[in-house]
């Protein structure tokens, strides 16, 4: 059994033998950093491991896992991961040589045998190298396929992890959100007054004993007002907070959909782009078969003639071209896979960072939810959940305006029930128990007296027993403690009768018949429960009355055999039902497990679909068999002719000649068979093309049928259009009739128009007369107009002066606004400087108009971490001052056409808006009379300055802190020197460095060769072997203690393994050893 580790960033996998023998999770991570990533990671804390179900790895059950997936945490936060991805890519990179085209020139008659044989042999060497390169490329293609599959699997696993993480937080948020939503839906802080008025309008209810109750008097009106105000202040804030969290969660869910879509796009792209890679195995097989054929034919070219060698040369030229084309195709597929893998690594890293951002958003949501969980709050501050609980209490108090009749009914029913229960308990159960127990004691006393009379006299003779046996029995004292008024206290109403409860239920039903008709029904059910409770107490009292009667177990078994059988049947039925429920539970658990996301692993299918070499061999065998069959027939004919005409010498010569012809024909048939083999390849290609054409033909026929169906549908549409056109023709005919009718009406209209013209001419004459009269009036008005113009000139001069004054006032107002903004910028800058120094400008407690500079711990570090701009300050004072500048947001529009209105606007702004707000703004910005200053010293003149006083005080605090830190530094340096001197006298056992004190011991080399070697002195160590002393001490010494002067690192390689000068200690290849130069320390 092995544990497989998958790298999410390059698809690399490794296996570890189980059980895992690491003692801690940290050591297991360090192993991954060391062996799996080759120290691309510098810290084991950056290792992030997940299981195949998207869960964090639990080291306690790691031996039960089969696969874990490794992620580099740095890629989740690094915005420029190119260098890290490059390091991971080099782990899986393998140098595959690019295609080298064949150097075999086309055949020409000028080539001699020597040139052709030399070219063919060099071409054979090229084909062998192509075969080797193709095998390497095919192996790399398979590796890339597995690695890309692992990377896709890791993307899905990370998505499952983020989905699970967000869903858990979302579920907890939903519980809180539903609770808050119910509060917002059922709030009564706006409508409680109407319900209170309805409650106050109810009449008093009078009990049977004469006592009356008015329900509205039980509520405190001031408390109701305070509750509504509290809910109004705080409920909207809580709802806004949860709406913001809900928007964040919706955004996260949308981002999850986007991530899932991007992963699916990458999968579709890989499927579409690498659908043709399935034929890579056939390419490799073709390359092998072609290369093998070239190498096989090269062995026979030494004995070949010039003509046969030319045919082989021509054949090798064509084969080399095919071999080169197939290797180029294989190399291009490899290049595409490499490029897609790099693209997938970059896109996957971007998706990992996106997942990390979603996780941080949900962590913020979780932190916000923790504020509403009272179990996770510390300190004495009131948590947000306590505020919600208080809102709920206030809402419950407001709900009493509706539910008080029902609650009061429940209360009086419970009072009566407790009264009856107490009555039965005290007078019935307790008194009966006392009587029955006393009867039992009396029976025991009588039994003991009878027994003592019969047996006791004999036993009294024995010395070991007392002469007088004790006849005392335990005493009995059953009393009732506490009364029945403790629970309700002052709310207790004495002498509540069942008639009162029945009357109250009818009273509630008659009043609340419209809004709360179910109140009376609920009260009736509760009243029935009271009756059941009292009847149960009656049964208990009756059962207590039979305590003194005794029934033996035998009689019970005899009396109730049927009851036992029924109980056993009932128990057996329950057992069967429990078994069925357990089976259903196991089925549901299996169903849940089967619905978990299962990601398929990389396929390991490397089977060969077909073997072109075998097919080509079969074809060539058929041709050769056919040619051999023809040759056999000819030889048989030749033999028969020899038998028939063996006597004739001339015939013998003819047969010899004929035999020679048959040999030539046989050679021609063999050459023809080889040519048929070569011709079969394009024939198979044409056959596959024919199949493709046939498939295309079927598709065309299907398209033809679809087009015919489409034509039929179009014909139906045309018929429909023709019907509609005939209907349109009928409508046109009807419209023509309407046009004829309208022309008749138009003729009548023209006749009326002539009459109207005549009337208009008459009216025109009257208008001419009136026009003459108006001309006379206009002459008189023109004279009046001249007088008005003279007055207008004087007015223009005055308006010009007003316009100049208005523009000057507008400019002054603008400059005043600019100066106010500059002053506010100074305040903002001073606040920013103070916060950079750890101070904050705030309002004094209880005085909003008095300002104070106070020290705030952690403010400076937060500012440095956040890198906020100068305008982003934490002090509320600049915001309050900015709110005072409301008057500065009022723009004065100077209208050149109406300067009087502009002047009125300026006056209105300056008097109505600036008088109060501007003076208040000036008083606040001055920081003179409205500040609280803490003096630095009694005689310091800077105490009258507000900001400089705080800065000076802060600098003095920093100066005092610097002195304190300098003093602590000197103390720590002294302690460091002491520890250094102390540690320099201790022997080092691991991680040797210069100036370490080391114990060296002599060792010996185990070698079979009888030669003199240097006796090694190695450092006594723990987990740090191969540290040898450079200088050889005296042979008689058994140990030495020396201080390291220098350490030189050496590595045993294949070249220096047997060199005694470079490997004097006969170490194995690949071992790193260190030559230590040390100075002996005297005792």
Swiss-Prot record:
Taxonomic source organism: Meyerozyma guilliermondii (strain ATCC 6260 / CBS 566 / DSM 6381 / JCM 1539 / NBRC 10279 / NRRL Y-324) (Yeast)
Family in the record: Belongs to the ATG11 family.
Classification via InterPro entries: ATG11, Atg11_C, ATG17-like_dom
Principal location: membrane
Signal peptide: none
Name of the gene: ATG11
Any one Gene Ontology cellular component term annotated for this protein: phagophore assembly site membrane
GO terms of biological process kind: autophagosome assembly; autophagy of mitochondrion; piecemeal microautophagy of the nucleus; protein transport; reticulophagy; ribophagy
Alphabetized GO MF terms: molecular adaptor activity; protein kinase binding
Subunit structure: Homodimer.
Coiled-coil features, chain-numbered ranges: 562-591, 648-812, 953-988
Pfam family, any one: ATG11
Topological relation to the membrane, as annotated: Peripheral membrane protein
Keywords: Autophagy, Coiled coil, Membrane, Protein transport, Transport, Vacuole
Protein known as: Autophagy-related protein 11
Subcellular location field: Preautophagosomal structure membrane; Vacuole membrane
